[in-house]
Amino acid sequence: MRITRRELFVLPAAGALAAAPSLVRYVRFLRGRTAAYGILDGETIRELRGSPFASPQPTGAVHKLSDVKLLYPCQPRKILAMALNYRSHLGDRQPPSRPELFWKPVSALQNPGDPIVIPPDAHNVHCEGELVLVIGRRVRNATTEQAREAIFGVTCGNDVSERDWQKGDIQWWRAKGADTFAPVGPVIVCGLDYGKLMLRTRLNGETIQEQSTADLIFDGPAIVRFASRYVTLEPGDLIFTGTPGTTRAMKPGDVVEVEIEGLGVLRNPVVAG
């Protein structure tokens, strides 16, 4: 699926506009059969040599956005995700006293525009729009300030979840980790104040989730600080920060969109496996 600039971006909220002049938008894309990183600038991508986390240099090549295929924007070694991080998603449960994290395998990653595949025996697969933190440096036992500095940028994510398996299985390995259950992208945005951005999830054009990231129970640095007590975080690692409100089941033929101000729109069709 080719994605245009108009499809990618919505303007950031007023509170985030102050950071706009220093924003950098990184993408990962296919040129022919080769994957590369680049900086998105209007309708063009300036190709980089190396990853955004290791002092990349421009190659001099420039590509039209419409001529390339966007991939999930980095290659993490690990993916963590937050449970119960908006009060609107708690139901009758009490707010957690500490960040509640779980794993999603890297094999669950899916590109912008590519399909979410529902396994044949899955009957209650929900979409969960989320802000995703991108780690930019190796960090262990971080202070709050070190945790803040370790967050390279942010992107959009969809924590696809099979609710029946969540309830029935001891572990969430398939409920949260089936192939294609972690669409991410389309860009990593650096320099944006992500503490007060409107997040919206749409299913077939209908808004089913809408809430500000200001309502997170645990903010980005708090999540990174807690996670780094137990797990060494490395450049490119991803942390989904939790989903707001209620969610809805998807079916083959649906299209789901996760939109966050300043970060663009992550759009994926849904197909049967």
Identify the residue ranges that each predicted region occupies.
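N-terminal non-catalytic cap/leader segment that marks the start of a structured domain
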Residues: 2-12, 17-99, 122, 171, ...
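Catalytic-pocket segment enriched in acidic/His residues
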Residues: 2-4, 89, 163-273
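A generic local secondary-structure boundary/capping motif
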Residues: 69-71, 90-92, 116-125, 139-146, ...
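Short Gly/aromatic-enriched secondary-structure transition segments
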Residues: 93-99, 144-155
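Structural signature of FAD isoalloxazine-binding scaffolds in flavoprotein oxidoreductases
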Residues: 95-112, 127, 257-261
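Ligand-binding beta-strand-loop-alpha-helix segment within the catalytic cores
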Residues: 129-131
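Short, conserved beta-strand element in jelly-roll/cupin
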Residues: 134-136
